[in-house]
């Protein structure tokens, strides 16, 4: 799955909680946190699905 991470990273993350389960096995609480991690990983992590990782 793809997430639009244009404009990231950002210093502050606000917004509605919408958990993102990433390929690194971590649950990110919202798109902002996921996109910050995505950019930091140089695009190596991907979105597995929306929701908490199981």
Swiss-Prot record:
Disulfide bonds join 5-35, 13-32, 21-53. The record marks 15-16 as: Reactive bond. Residues 1-54 form the Kazal-like domain. It comes from the Eukaryota. It holds the Pfam family Kazal_1. Its main location: secreted. It is found in: Secreted. One of its GO terms (cellular component) is extracellular region. The keyword Disulfide bond applies. The keyword Thylakoid does not apply. Keywords: Disulfide bond, Secreted. Expressed by the venom gland. Partially inhibits trypsin in vitro at slightly acidic pH and concentrations in excess of 0.3 mM. Has no protease inhibitory activity at neutral or basic pH. Has no antibacterial activity. Shows no toxicity in vertebrates apart from transient paw edema in mouse. May form disulfide-linked dimers or trimers (in vitro). This is Kazal-type inhibitor-like protein.
